């Protein structure tokens, strides 16, 4: 999970900063990641058992498939319903793929200023596809990359939630996942109703 959170920052440093700052930022980020993963002692209170749950491989695969379905139904691929604001976000994502970084619009003398972290890894993976095969192929790949990246993130959130809840039975795991999924916006119901 820490690597998932660190990756967009690493891509930002590499793609948006000048070389000396990028190298320094990446070095600090790599050290912080290494320290957090390898050197930070696990903090436990006296008498507290170590938290952990066991999930079989089929359950892990099913959970990832559920996260893929959730992302698909949420509009990640563009093949299913998307709220009206997806048009703006798709344009920003496309600009991250088709323009050099940092994204600058000379006709308006302005830069792309937005919270772009979630798109940076899929956009970086898509840039070579755009360079080799053009926009149509790149956009298809980009939608799949964003879908996979989002599914991975929600998968890690779901796993961490299940550990936090100590969901050690199928019933507890199901309730935890229902809570996670239905805690979010339910705007699709409005779209289906209209």
Model-derived features with residue positions:
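Hydrophobic alpha-helical membrane-interfacial segments at the cytosolic entry of transmembrane helices
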Residues: 58-66, 174-181
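Alpha-helical transmembrane segments
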Residues: 1-8, 59-70
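Long, contiguous, compositionally biased segments that the model treats as domain-scale units
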Residues: 56-59, 72, 76
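Active-site lumenal/periplasmic loops and adjacent helix-entry segments of GT-C-fold
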Residues: 73-194
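Short, mixed-charge, low-aromatic patches
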Residues: 46-54, 76-83
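Membrane-embedded, hydrophobic transmembrane alpha-helices
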Residues: 1-53, 153-156, 165-166, 172, ...
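Membrane-interface helix-boundary signature
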Residues: 52, 56-59, 139-142
């Amino acid at each position: 999970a820490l690597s998932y959170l660190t990756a967009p920052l690493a891509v930002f440093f590499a793609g948006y900063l000048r070389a000396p700052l990028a190298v320094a930022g990446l070095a600090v980020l790599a050290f912080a990641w290494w320290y957090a993963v390898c050197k930070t002692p696990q903090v436990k209170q006296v008498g507290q058992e170590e938290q952990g749950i066991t999930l079989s491989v089929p359950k892990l695969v099913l959970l990832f498939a559920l996260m893929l379905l959730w992302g698909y139904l949420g509009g990640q691929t563009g093949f299913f319903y998307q709220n009206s604001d997806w048009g703006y976000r798709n344009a920003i994502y496309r600009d991250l793929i088709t323009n050099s970084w940092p994204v600058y619009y000379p006709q308006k003398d302005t830069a792309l200023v937005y919270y772009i972290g979630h798109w940076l890894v899929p956009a970086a993976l898509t840039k070579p596809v755009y360079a080799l095969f053009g926009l149509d192929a790149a956009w298809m790949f980009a939608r799949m990359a964003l879908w996979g990246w989002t599914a991975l993130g929600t998968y890690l959130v779901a796993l961490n939630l299940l550990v936090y809840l100590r969901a050690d039975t199928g019933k507890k795991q199901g309730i935890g996942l229902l809570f996670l999924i239905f805690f979010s916006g339910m705007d699709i119901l409005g779209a289906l109703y209209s």
